[in-house]
């Protein structure tokens, strides 16, 4: 399953915060969850594209950052799969 997560920092990120999130992301990789994070300009500070087996796995990943960021997550269906549903 794929998920798109829009991210806003709750406070301006410092080197310590970034180091902490990097450690958490490294731990998440070891759990087999694939993701890419892009910092963005505009209303959101970053966007993450997550590939996880279940919604529960994706939610557990995001809960690791509770208190640090606000998120909005959407399930993403690959275009090819969505077209098959038409």
Mark where each language-model region is:
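An amphipathic, aromatic/His-enriched active-site/gating alpha helix that lines ligand/cofactor pockets
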Residues: 52-83
